[in-house]
Amino acid sequence: TLAALGGAIYAGPVKKAAEFEAQMSTVKAISNASADDMKRLSEEAKHMGATTKFTAVEAGKALEYMAMAGWKTDQMLGGLPGIMNLAAASGEDLGQVSDIVTDALTAFNMTADQSGRFADVLAQASSNANTNVSMMGATFQKVAPVAGALGYSVEDMSLGIGLMAN
């Protein structure tokens, strides 16, 4: 009936708004961000949801992984575009890509402001080898802590992983 159709039309946006609020509550709980910082993070997630192929909820999930890595608000805001570009280019899940990038940056003693560089290196390596971002991320998970401690660069490791994948 018309009432049921109207309810269904109204329920969709309400559910999405509730999902977004729940996701951002998770970010707040992990990051312990102030109300002002949460406003900035929420606005950026909504902006990314409106201007990229990803939803605001997915952008919030990426922020969650950044918060788990100990990134502060400005680091999250600075790192989000590069991570989103890598996820878009690879066609992979944004949250998973954020997890890969934040974990690898930590292992290589790189800072959040280097996430764009790391994302570019990973995108290039995965597109030039018989691998993808997820497989490279799984490999980085195993080798990055040792490689980083030994002073190897992300570029060296990406090249090595790409060669082994071929």
Residue ranges and their predicted role:
Residues 2-50, 61-69, 76-90, 96-129, ...:
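Small-residue helix-packing and pore-constriction motifs in hydrophobic alpha-helices
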